[in-house]
Curated annotation (Swiss-Prot):
Family: Belongs to the FKBP-type PPIase family.
Keywords (A to Z) from UniProt: Chloroplast, Isomerase, Plastid, Rotamase, Thylakoid, Transit peptide
Free-text function comment from the UniProt entry: PPIases accelerate the folding of proteins. It catalyzes the cis-trans isomerization of proline imidic peptide bonds in oligopeptides.
Pfam family, one: FKBP_C
Localization (cell): Plastid, Chloroplast thylakoid lumen
Transit peptide stretch: 1-63
Enzyme class: isomerase
Protein name, entry field: Peptidyl-prolyl cis-trans isomerase FKBP17-1, chloroplastic
EC number: 5.2.1.8
GO molecular function (one): peptidyl-prolyl cis-trans isomerase activity
Cellular component aspect of the GO annotation: chloroplast thylakoid lumen
Keyword Iron: no
Residues annotated as domain PPIase FKBP-type: 105-225
Amino acid sequence: MIRCFAWTPLVGAPLITTVHFTSPPSLRIFASRSSAPSSSSSSSSTVAAASRRSISLSIIAVTSSVVSSFCFSSPALADFSEIPNSGGVKALDLRIGDGDVPIEGDQIEIHYYGRLAAKQGWRFDSTYDHKDSNGEAVPFTFVLGSSKVIPGIETAVRSMKVGGIRRVVIPPSQGYQNTSQEPLPPNFFDRQRLFTTIFNPTRLANGEGSTLGTLVFDIELVSTRRLHR
């Protein structure tokens, strides 16, 4: 089984491409029948073995070619930099902003696109889907330093400028620690799927805690406003 996922850079609401191979691509191989009779069963076995090797190599070649074309179409993890003193949050700036840098206590507005790595990049929420009465996307608002949101998002925006877009990989320790931390998907079934994956007791007992809650967020810093002068 081969699974890969590639994410496109954020332009408005970014797209996600997921590719699954539950079995290798099927190949049909035609062989001409020899007019001469087989000399021995040993010869037949040799030909059969060679055919099997040929099929295996062909499958590997085709599979590798297809996977390469999809899996490496997005920025590699090596392109990310770990944010200092972040607990392991890795960031890649897709666009550098030209506005203010937020400070503690500011009211922040962001657009985001959140995915869960343990579900092959399943998108669990996006503010681009949250519309007001005019059909405009409604940004997510919070106060920096209030501990209202998961630590990884606060860490990400602290070093951004307004107008910037940043992709961050958030390890479980900087992600959801309970089901009340924001941002929360407004859809009940999305919330349920998100938290039953992250806090799955069986998988946690199997030692998967270091990966289950890994999140990938594309964050656009829309605005920052000083609440206290």
